[in-house]
């Protein structure tokens, strides 16, 4: 390859990268502009304070409220700290105003399991599921504990017709 050809090819490559980056940025900005202009069917949305923490964590329409619970590192009733990486979850049971929620924790890598030995599949896997019982009328968490432990990247899952939870590892 001649020196002149090399420089022409290099200039063309640099120019195409600059154009592709500009086009990608323009596409991203247009997508954000479109998302910002979408109106809620329930009216305009605005920051709303969490009833548990007082923090503005969500944007909601007028008249809507929420209460957060089961934060990472909160102590559960079984003496275990709530794992992080909250992910897929579902309501598996109801009893009056109480719902039982099973929540996946998509923890990957070599981390110690969070649950007791009796419910741990692999002691060097930090994922699993937790069970939370929440009273929707009182707006408070009633119980929480480890459900399974020692799995990897529990991401998706689903409630079965029998009111149980299937958790799926993302490996």
For the regions a protein language model found, what residue spans apply to each?
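Short, conserved, GDST-rich strand-edge loop motifs in beta-rich repeat architectures
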Residues: 104-124, 171
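N-terminal export signals
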Residues: 5-28
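N-terminal secretory signal peptides
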Residues: 1-2
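Beta-propeller blade signature
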Residues: 126-135
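Short coil/turn segments that connect the beta-strands within blades of beta-propeller domains
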Residues: 99, 162-163
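Structural signature of eukaryotic scaffold interfaces centered on beta-propeller domains
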Residues: 87-95, 155-161
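Blade-edge beta-strand/turn elements of extracellular beta-propeller
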Residues: 54-72, 79-80, 135-148
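C-terminal segment of N-terminal export signals and the immediately downstream linker at the start
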Residues: 20-60
């Amino acid at each position: 390859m001649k020196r002149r050809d090399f420089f022409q090819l290099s200039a063309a490559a640099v120019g195409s990268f600059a154009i592709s980056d500009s086009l990608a940025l323009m596409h991203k900005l247009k997508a954000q502009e479109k998302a910002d202009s979408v109106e809620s069917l329930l009216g305009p949305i605005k920051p709303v304070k969490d009833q548990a923490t007082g923090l503005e964590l969500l944007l909601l329409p007028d008249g809507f409220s929420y209460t957060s619970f089961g934060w990472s590192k909160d102590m559960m009733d079984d003496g275990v700290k709530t794992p992080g990486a909250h992910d897929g979850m579902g309501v598996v049971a109801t009893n009056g105003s109480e719902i039982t929620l099973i929540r996946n924790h998509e923890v990957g890598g070599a981390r110690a399991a969070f649950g007791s030995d009796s419910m741990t599949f692999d002691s060097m896997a930090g994922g699993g599921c937790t069970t939370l019982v929440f009273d929707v009328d009182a707006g408070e968490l009633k119980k929480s504990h480890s459900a399974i432990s020692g799995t990897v990247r529990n991401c998706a899952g689903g409630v079965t017709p029998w009111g149980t939870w299937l958790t799926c590892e993302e490996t």
